[in-house]
């Protein structure tokens, strides 16, 4: 069995703070410094998002080769200097890499960078967004426990909570995330988390993270937020009280539809010990010689336990190459997301005024005053490049429209630089029954769009040409 040393657990926490630390730590002012004209250190400079996405985790060139780009450390394992060194690694007295299933230097840079961008203390990259969601809930809930989740979440996460985890004794109650009384009433003594998405899937409805966090914390449980559709460039849920954030990195982080991966970010703010509901994080773990993750890893206890236990035993490890691709994606995240949003808002306006469209499901044109308020609060610069609209003519018209698009690709992914389209009821959400489809706001005439970064005139022309075929 491969074990993660206790001091390596602490190292995982400390490494995340070497460059910029948390947002609350930046800039750090040394009040003892008398010379006010002295050059600021990196930690004292209040670097913005666009700078963080390029530099966190690799502040200096590679120490071995002087390469400025992050190297791909394509290795399964690491050499020990001698038997004594190997024993020290396994014996919890020397920090460092042991085996590629647990840690890798390329992955480490990606984890530091996304943690900094989200404002967390630590992160863990894994093989897929589905693995990220699964690990989060497995780390929180065990047989006999319960999760409260919003109805308007990704279909894969819905199936995980509704069908897969119940086979292991973990149940879920799905609620309207805008009915706070319903959310409160769904919480039981054995509830271990509330889960929502920043932007609902697939209609991009905006949840009130701050309100839901206050409900969760009143019951001494964490708020878990899937921030895939928003990205930390538009919203940082931790700033509004979220405790755990995760992403399908396949989407905006990668951005080009080439690479599968996921990532979990630990805010470091939830007090697992004071809650009294999470003994596996607090009490001694027998597979690590009685280590308590809260005591050993401090604020990074949550993701450290996933790495040390779940990743060790179930192995949904991200590859170094995929971590490298995601680092490339992060370097242009702000630029791409700005263009995605700019294009999407113009498409929303176009569709909202089209005679063959019954309704556009996007918060910017919602007739719900609460949605308008939340959209302005959480997305002051706009957001929601993945959304749906309902076309006149039912399912037949929806499918004909999709089949006549040329620029849009018909596929199951979203958040690609290329514009994408799909008919959710017959594909991505086809495993849901009629009631579940209604809960998620999906009808037979619903079409989901993921607006890319092409020239906006070309995007709208493609939509216009497809609409013309319905009038023939």
Regions found by a protein language model. Give the residues of each.
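Conserved C-terminal alpha-helix-loop-beta "cap" of PLP-dependent enzymes
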Residues: 337, 345, 349-352, 356-447, ...
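Conserved PLP-enzyme active-site core in the AAT-like
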Residues: 42-44, 60-61, 123-354, 361
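Short conserved active-site loop signatures built around small residues
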Residues: 38-73, 264
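Conserved N-terminal alpha-helix of the aminotransferase class I/II PLP-enzyme fold
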Residues: 82-131, 156-163
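PLP-dependent enzyme catalytic core of the Aspartate aminotransferase-like
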Residues: 22, 38-39, 121, 162, ...
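Short, Lys/Arg-enriched N-terminal segments with co-localized hydrophobic residues
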Residues: 18, 23-36
């Amino acid at each position: 069995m491969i074990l993660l040393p206790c001091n390596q657990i602490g190292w995982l926490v400390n490494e995340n703070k070497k460059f910029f630390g948390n947002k609350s730590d930046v800039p750090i002012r040394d009040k003892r410094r008398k010379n006010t004209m002295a050059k600021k250190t990196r930690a004292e400079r209040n670097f913005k998002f666009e700078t963080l996405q390029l530099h966190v985790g690799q502040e200096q060139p590679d120490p071995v080769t002087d390469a400025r780009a992050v190297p791909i450390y394509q290795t399964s394992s690491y050499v020990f200097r001698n038997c004594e060194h190997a024993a020290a690694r396994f014996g919890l007295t020397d920090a460092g890499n042991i085996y590629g299933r647990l840690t890798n230097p390329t992955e480490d840079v990606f984890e530091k960078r996304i943690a900094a961008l989200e404002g967390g203390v630590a992160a863990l990259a894994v093989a897929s967004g589905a693995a990220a969601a699964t690990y989060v809930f497995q780390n929180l809930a065990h047989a006999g426990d319960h999760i409260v989740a919003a109805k308007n979440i990704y279909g894969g996460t819905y199936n995980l909570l509704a069908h897969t985890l119940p086979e292991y004794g973990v149940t879920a109650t799905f609620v309207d995330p805008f009915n706070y009384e319903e959310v409160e009433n769904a919480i039981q003594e054995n509830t271990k988390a509330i889960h929502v998405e920043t932007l609902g899937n697939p209609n991009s409805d905006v949840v009130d993270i701050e309100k839901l966090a206050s409900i969760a914390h009143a019951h001494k449980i964490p708020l878990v937020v899937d921030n895939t559709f928003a990205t930390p460039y538009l919203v940082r849920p931790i700033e509004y009280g979220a405790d755990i954030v995760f992403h399908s990195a396949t989407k905006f982080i990668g951005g080009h539809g080439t690479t599968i991966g996921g990532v979990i970010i630990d805010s470091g703010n939830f007090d697992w010990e004071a809650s009294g509901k999470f003994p596996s994080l607090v009490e001694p773990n027998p597979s690590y010689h009685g280590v308590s993750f809260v005591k050993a890893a401090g604020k990074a206890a949550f993701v450290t336990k996933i790495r040390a236990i779940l990743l060790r035993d179930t192995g949904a490890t991200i590859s170094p190459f995929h971590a490298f691709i995601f680092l490339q994606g992060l370097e242009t995240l702000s630029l791409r997301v700005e263009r995605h949003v700019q294009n999407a808002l113009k498409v929303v306006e176009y569709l909202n005024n089209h005679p063959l469209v019954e309704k556009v499901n996007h918060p910017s044109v919602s007739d719900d005053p609460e949605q308008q308020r939340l959209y302005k609060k959480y997305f002051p610069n706009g957001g929601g490049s993945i959304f749906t609209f309902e076309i006149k003519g039912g399912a037949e018209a929806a499918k004909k429209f999709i089949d006549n698009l040329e620029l849009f690709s018909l596929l199951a992914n979203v958040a690609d630089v290329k514009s994408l389209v799909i008919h959710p009821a017959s594909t991505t959400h086809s495993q849901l029954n009629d009631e579940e489809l209604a809960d998620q706001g999906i009808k037979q005439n619903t079409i989901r769009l993921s607006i890319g970064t092409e020239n906006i005139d070309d995007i709208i022309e493609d939509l216009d040409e497809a609409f013309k075929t319905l009038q023939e």
